[in-house]
């Protein structure tokens, strides 16, 4: 057979226009708040270097010194009294207010990102809080000096450390600060506090515009021809004809050879033979070649990270709207850092079922799920009869009937109305949950709406009131002390555990309308959905242009033998042709059925003695025929010269066909002869093997079919979160605003770049065979095609009885006078076929008168089958015919009735996860988020340095006189 050469690749088709954006889904109702999830425990990154110390605030202006009090008149000098009893300890002073926090230092560089994939281990439990650092020693108490005048208030210092509660001694000058204690190592993070109330969800972005359709792929190469079907059964042979009447003996004819007479009129065509069985269906052809990949889109611009908004409470899942068109697949972005697990949202309401999608390719069968138990529900109502189903399994082949004459094809019938759908039965109980499928590829984000604000969180716990101290005596104002040197800020303390969540503030005012963002990257491909219902049949497309004639295909398997056509009218007598060369001996044919006995022929020339044949079975003796009258004996003449070879006689009747011979070597191609007259239209033969398809050329696109456009597939799961942005500087707490109105919807974003073409998926399994459509009218018969090369086909089954072969040449007259016909003897065994002898020489004597023809004997019984003859010589190769043109395409038959929707196939395995898309462009600044919960109390501040000793105060008033 020939080698299949794929044709050149056709040009790419025009690029499709982007589809319209999908309609937004309805706003969902607020669902109950979800249960708080377990706190995540990712590995703690290395601690960054400490930031530079913050700048100290400018000192405030010095207060004006107070006026000294007027000096009173000196009292009388009293006697020196006895030492009085020790006074009671003074009341504990009120605790001073905590100093304001210093400016926050610049954040140190972030530690290295954890780029590796998330480990499969379970979440770790939160570690226990580490021990607090050792506290520094308190400074020694200085001696109490006289109280000085009260100086002006200095600038607020850094918060001092809370000292231990002690007994108030006599107030002295502040001692110098003791050595600072060693800072303790930070302990492991303590248990996470209760999660604060979630913020309002941000509005979802607009769906991206539908990407351009890729160029159509090149049509796949056609499949190889199917295997040859089995031949039909051999028809029974007809009974022998009746015996003809005996002819009268004719007058002796002239020895001169007359010219051949005109050909007789052809008889009427015989009845058609029985139609053979249809051949078996061929194997499916190989998978077609994949189409060319589409153009790769450019990477999208990388956006700037937006400010982190306060997360609102997760609203309930709204009803599932019609998903928008899938955006183009963006360029792969950098792998994001795995985020901590979020709180699980509340289960959304069941969405309305979507429209049936287009027919997907049948995926490989999935694992069979467990059979569900029968539910206790009542049986459903009986549905109405549905539309015609698929044909059932093919029954056993019946006995072949006699083929009738082929009728004229009728006009196509009208399409019947579709049957009514059956009523839905009562819903049964849910079956057991099947195994969890693999995670589908990420789909595009749907157009969600902002949910309603969630309920307010629980109010925070009120702090415990401190113990009220005893108010101390108001001392005399001391003198203003000298301004101390500027101290350095202390190191930041260990972060304490988070405090309880405070009450939730009111919703802020709505912000400005944000600009439309660019469409996000195309998500991974989702799982294949269930097979949708069969769509309505499309209109007949425009007939494509006839493609160029392809190279001759390899010789296909021989087709089934066609029915014998009617015999054509006899042609005019042809001129006597020149004798051809003797061909190679052909293969022996099988013994044909015994025909009726022919009339007695004239004796032929004596041939060479044939080889001794095998002895056949003896046949029964035939009846003796009547003895004819003896003819006159002629004079024996002298042998004459050898005559010229006679011309070929008229063609005889066609003999039975022989068995298929062995394939000989191909002969040389002969010259093309003149085209013969058109023959009668024969019956349609069996379907031959399919040849190879020539190079595919893309024809003009046909008109769109009348079927409805399928709805897009379901949204895929959410993608992995992106890398967190740098931590911003903490702002001051804003005023709680009133809840604002919802902003207007932004304009749809620009279409994103076209993504890379997806990889070719595995070839789906063959679908079920549909019902056969009505047969269309026969197409115009094309001219005969070129004969293919002779292939080494398998030996076929014996053929049916063929038409009688051409009559052989008439033998030459022998040299002797014709003898008297003898009585017919018993039929002897059939000998082997003798070789053709050389032409005998013509005798010199005159030909004797021909004896009267004997009466025709009855038909003898069928003799035994003869031995296989010698293989004949191979004939010359026939003239190569012109290749015919392709026949015109017949009109399409009426569309068949739509079949019932088949059961949903098993979900195919999830495809490989595509690379993450590139980051989208930054959106506008969002609304001011709600104030976060009050953070935990800051670390304990460092004890400030002791100030300088103030100047001595004025003398106090004289004490009371002592006891006498």
Swiss-Prot record:
In-chain residues carrying the UniProt-annotated modification 3-hydroxyproline:
665, 936, 951, 954, 957
Tissue expression, as annotated, is: Expressed in bones.
Q: Basic and acidic residues bias: where? A: 56-70, 865-879
Domain of life the protein comes from: Eukaryota
Modified residue annotations for 5-hydroxylysine: 92, 243, 314, 531, 642, 807, 868, 880
User: What is a single cellular component term in the Gene Ontology annotation?
Assistant: extracellular region
Q: Where located?
A: Secreted; Secreted, Extracellular space; Secreted, Extracellular space, Extracellular matrix
Quick one: where is this thing mainly located?
A: secreted
Gly residues bias (residue ranges): 294-303
Entry PTM? Contains mostly 4-hydroxyproline. Proline residues at the third position of the tripeptide repeating unit (G-X-Y) are hydroxylated in some or all of the chains.
Q: Where is the composition biased (Pro residues)?
A: 146-158, 620-632, 771-781, 815-830, 949-964
Does Phosphoprotein count among this protein's keywords? Answer: yes
Residues annotated as glycosylated: 92, 880
Which keywords, in A-to-Z order, does the entry hold? Answer: Extinct organism protein, Extracellular matrix, Glycoprotein, Hydroxylation, Phosphoprotein, Secreted
Which residues, renumbered to this chain, carry the PTM Phosphoserine?
Answer: 98, 567
**What are the Low complexity biased-composition ranges?**
106-117, 126-144, 192-231, 347-373, 381-400, 459-468, 564-578, 591-618, 647-663, 709-721, 850-864, 898-931
Disordered: annotated span: 1-964
Indicate whether Glycoprotein appears among the record's keywords: yes
Residues modified to 4-hydroxyproline: 18, 21, 24, 33, 36, 39, 53, 68, 74, 83, 89, 126, 147, 156, 159, 186, 189, 201, 207, 216, 222, 225, 240, 249, 252, 260, 269, 284, 290, 299, 305, 323, 332, 338, 344, 353, 356, 365, 374, 379, 391, 400, 409, 412, 430, 447, 453, 459, 465, 471, 477, 489, 498, 510, 519, 537, 552, 558, 579, 585, 588, 597, 603, 621, 630, 639, 651, 657, 666, 675, 678, 704, 712, 721, 739, 748, 751, 757, 772, 778, 784, 792, 798, 818, 821, 824, 895, 898, 916, 931, 937, 952, 955, 958, 961, 964
Its annotated function is as follows: Type I collagen is a member of group I collagen (fibrillar forming collagen).
Record family assignment: Belongs to the fibrillar collagen family.
| Further remarks about this protein from its record | These protein fragments were extracted from an ancient humerus epiphysis bone collected in Haiti.
Assembly, in brief, is: Trimers of one alpha 2(I) and two alpha 1(I) chains.
Q: What is this protein called?
A: Collagen alpha-1(I) chain
Native source organism of the sequence: Parocnus serus
């Amino acid at each position: 057979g020939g080698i299949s050469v794929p044709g050149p690749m056709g040009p790419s088709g025009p690029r499709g226009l982007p589809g319209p954006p999908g309609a937004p889904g309805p706003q969902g109702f607020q669902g109950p708040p979800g249960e708080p999830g377990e706190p995540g425990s990712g590995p703690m990154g290395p601690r960054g270097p400490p930031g530079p110390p913050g700048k100290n605030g400018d000192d405030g202006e010095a207060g004006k010194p107070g006026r000294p009090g007027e000096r009173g008149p000196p009292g009388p000098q009293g006697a020196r009294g006895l030492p009085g009893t020790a006074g009671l300890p003074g009341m504990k002073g009120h605790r001073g207010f905590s100093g304001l926090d210093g400016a926050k230092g610049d954040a140190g560089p972030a530690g290295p990102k954890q780029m590796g994939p998330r480990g499969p281990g379970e979440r770790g439990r939160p570690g226990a809080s580490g021990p607090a650092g050792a506290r520094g020693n308190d400074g020694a108490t200085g001696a109490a000096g006289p109280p000085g005048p009260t100086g002006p208030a200095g600038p607020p210092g850094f918060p001092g450390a809370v000292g231990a509660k002690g007994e108030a001694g006599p107030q002295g000058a502040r001692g110098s600060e003791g050595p600072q204690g060693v800072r303790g190592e930070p302990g492991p993070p303590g248990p996470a506090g209760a999660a604060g109330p979630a913020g309002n969800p941000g509005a979802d972005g607009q769906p991206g515009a539908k990407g351009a359709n890729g160029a159509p792929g090149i049509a796949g190469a056609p499949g190889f021809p199917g295997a040859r079907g089995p031949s039909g059964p051999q028809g029974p042979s007809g009974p022998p004809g009746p015996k003809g009447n005996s002819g009268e003996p004719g007058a002796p004819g002239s020895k001169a050879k007359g010219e051949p007479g005109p050909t007789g009129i052809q008889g009427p065509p015989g009845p058609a033979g029985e139609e053979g069985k249809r051949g078996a269906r061929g194997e499916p052809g190989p998978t077609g070649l994949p189409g060319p990949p589409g153009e790769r889109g450019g990477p999208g611009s990388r956006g700037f990270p937006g400010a982190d908004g306060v997360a609102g409470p997760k609203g309930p899942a709204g009803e599932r709207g019609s998903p928008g068109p899938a955006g183009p697949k963006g360029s792969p972005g950098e792998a994001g850092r795995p985020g901590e697990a979020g709180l699980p949202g509340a289960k959304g309401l069941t969405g309305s079922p979507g429209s049936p999608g287009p027919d997907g390719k049948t995926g490989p069968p999935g694992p069979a799920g467990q059979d569900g138990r029968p539910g206790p529900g009542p049986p459903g109502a009986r549905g109405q009869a549905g539309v015609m189903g698929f044909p059932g399994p093919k029954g056993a082949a019946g006995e072949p009937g006699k083929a009738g004459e082929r009728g004229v094809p009728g006009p196509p019938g009208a399409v019947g109305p579709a049957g009514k759908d059956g009523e839905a039965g009562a819903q049964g109980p849910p079956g057991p949950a099947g195994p969890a499928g693999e995670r589908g590829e990420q789909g595009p984000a749907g157009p969600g709406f902002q949910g309603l604000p969630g309920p307010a969180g629980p109010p925070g716990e009120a702090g415990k009131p401190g113990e009220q101290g005893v108010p101390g005596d108001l001392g005399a104002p001391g003198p203003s002390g000298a301004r101390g040197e500027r101290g350095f800020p202390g190191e930041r303390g260990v972060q304490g555990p988070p405090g309880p969540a405070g009450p939730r503030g009111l919703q802020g005012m709505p912000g400005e309308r944000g600009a439309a963002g660019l469409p996000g990257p195309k998500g991974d491909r989702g799982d294949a959905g269930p097979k949708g219902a069969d769509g309505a049949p499309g209109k007949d497309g425009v007939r494509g242009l006839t493609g160029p004639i392809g190279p001759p295909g390899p010789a296909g398997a021989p087709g089934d033998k066609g029915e014998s056509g009617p015999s054509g009218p006899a042609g005019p007598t042809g001129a006597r042709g020149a004798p051809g060369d003797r061909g190679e001996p052909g293969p022996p044919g099988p013994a044909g059925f015994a025909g009726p006995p022919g009339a007695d022929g004239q004796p032929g020339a004596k041939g060479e003695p044939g080889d001794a044949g095998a002895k056949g079975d003896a046949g029964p003796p035939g009846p003796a025929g009547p003895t004819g009258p003896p003819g006159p004996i002629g004079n024996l003449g002298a042998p004459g010269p050898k005559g010229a070879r006679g011309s070929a006689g008229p063609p005889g009747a066609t003999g039975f066909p022989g068995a298929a011979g062995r394939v000989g070597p191909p002969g040389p191609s002969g010259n093309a002869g003149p085209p013969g007259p058109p023959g009668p239209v024969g019956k349609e033969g069996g379907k031959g093997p399919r040849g190879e398809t020539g190079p595919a050329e893309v024809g003009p696109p046909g008109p769109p079919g009348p079927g409805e456009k399928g709805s897009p597939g379901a949204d895929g799961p959410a993608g992995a979160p992106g890398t967190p942005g740098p931590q911003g500087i903490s702002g001051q707490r804003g005023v709680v605003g009133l809840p604002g109105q919802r902003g207007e919807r932004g304009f749809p974003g620009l279409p994103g770049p076209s993504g890379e073409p997806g990889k070719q998926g595995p070839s789906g399994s063959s679908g079920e065979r549909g019902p056969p459509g009505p047969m269309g009218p026969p197409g115009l018969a094309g001219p005969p095609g070129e004969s293919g090369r002779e292939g080494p086909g398998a030996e076929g089954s014996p053929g049916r009885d063929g038409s009688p072969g051409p009559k052989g040449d008439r033998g030459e007259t022998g040299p002797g006078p014709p003898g008297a016909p003898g009585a017919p003897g018993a039929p002897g065994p059939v000998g082997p076929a003798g070789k053709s002898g050389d032409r005998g020489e013509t005798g010199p004597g005159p030909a004797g008168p021909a004896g009267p023809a004997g009466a025709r004997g009855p038909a003898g019984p069928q003799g035994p089958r003869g031995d296989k003859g010698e293989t004949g010589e191979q004939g010359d190769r026939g003239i190569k015919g012109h290749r015919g043109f392709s026949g015109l395409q017949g009109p399409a038959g009426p569309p068949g009735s739509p079949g019932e929707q088949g059961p949903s196939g098993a979900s195919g395995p999830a495809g490989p996860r595509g690379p993450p898309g590139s980051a989208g462009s930054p959106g506008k600044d969002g609304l001011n988020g709600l104030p976060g919960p009050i953070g935990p109390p800051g670390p304990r501040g460092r004890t400030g340095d002791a100030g300088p000793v103030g100047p001595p105060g004025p003398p106090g008033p004289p004490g009371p006189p002592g006891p006498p």
